[in-house]
């Protein structure tokens, strides 16, 4: 009898609540509750990600609108206020490059400004609603490409065009200063030449050699102010070259910073996605173990 009772005790389950209906219901509720908590956390993460994208789109549009308005206004003022010297022959292609660069700069920034003006009110209206589910009413997800295009035009392409605009304005403004005067003297028609009377006695006293010397000698042309006589370029050309020499390394620094910034941003996003995937795989392993 003792042995039988021992055998019966050994055959009893370790968790007696498993055979009871109440115990099995409690276990199922525990698993179900854990699943709901996991799904709720996932939904919360998706909603938080949507709100983050909304705020990021709003910040990009605000920055694009401010930058585009400032730079396009500067380009228009530069084109209107620049004074061209009519008696100076500009290098070939300089005025064409200045006009084309200014036009493209204004067009690019006006496009970014138009996108910001059209999308920003709708995003602002949704972001001011204190409701977590209202994020889906914003058009920033559907028009994400236009937001990125406006951001790229305003910050990347628009900035490089602005640097080129500064260089061209320097050339157009400073090149005529102190430039050598290579224009030929104007030809006066014979009908406008006043008659000159010379006495015969004075003409007879002049020898042929002295007359030729008198006709060939002309007063020397004065050099332009602040220019060394005999030099091919004036101080204006030197000032334009100085601005170009300064702006070229600045443009290279801008390009290097832009590449480094976007590379670091992509690396940061990649690390964040890896961490999220590792967390999901860990949660999946815990659920499978349960």
Curated annotation (Swiss-Prot):
The gene is Orai3. This is Protein orai-3. It comes from the Eukaryota. CRAC channels are regulated by fast Ca(2+)-dependent inactivation (FCDI), a mechanism that limits Ca(2+) influx and cell toxicity. ORAI3 subunit displays prominent FCDI. Inhibited by lanthanides such as Gd(3+) ions. Pfam families: Orai-1. The keyword Transport applies. The modification Phosphoserine is found at residues 42, 45. It is found in: Cell membrane. It comes from Rattus norvegicus (Rat). One of its GO terms (molecular function) is store-operated calcium channel activity.
């Amino acid at each position: 009898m003792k042995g039988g009772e021992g055998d019966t005790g050994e055959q009893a389950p370790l968790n007696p609540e498993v055979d009871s209906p109440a115990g099995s219901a409690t276990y199922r509720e525990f698993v179900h509750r854990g699943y709901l908590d996991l799904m709720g956390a996932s939904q919360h993460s998706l909603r938080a990600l949507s709100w983050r994208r909304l705020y990021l789109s709003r910040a990009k549009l605000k920055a694009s609108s401010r930058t585009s308005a400032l730079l396009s206004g500067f380009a228009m003022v530069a084109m209107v206020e620049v004074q061209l010297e009519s008696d100076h022959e500009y290098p070939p292609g300089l005025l064409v490059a200045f006009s084309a660069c200014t036009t493209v700069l204004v067009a690019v920034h006006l496009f970014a400004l138009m996108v910001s003006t059209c999308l920003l009110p709708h995003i602002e209206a949704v972001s001011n609603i204190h409701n977590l589910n209202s994020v889906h009413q914003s058009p920033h997800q559907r028009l994400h490409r236009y937001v990125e295009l406006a951001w790229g035009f305003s910050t990347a392409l628009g900035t490089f065009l602005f640097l080129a605009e500064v260089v061209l304005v320097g050339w157009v403004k400073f090149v005529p200063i102190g430039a050598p005067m290579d224009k030929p003297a104007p030809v006066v028609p014979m009908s406008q030449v006043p008659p000159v009377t010379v006495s015969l006695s004075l003409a007879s006293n002049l020898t042929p050699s002295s007359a030729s010397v008198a006709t060939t000698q002309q007063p020397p042309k004065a050099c332009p102010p602040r220019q060394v006589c005999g030099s091919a370029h004036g101080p204006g050309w030197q000032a334009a070259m100085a601005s170009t020499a300064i702006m070229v390394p600045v443009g290279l620094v801008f390009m290097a910073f832009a590449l480094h910034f976007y590379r670091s941003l992509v690396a940061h996003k990649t690390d964040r996605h890896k961490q999220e995937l590792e967390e999901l795989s860990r949660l999946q392993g815990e659920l499978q173990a349960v």
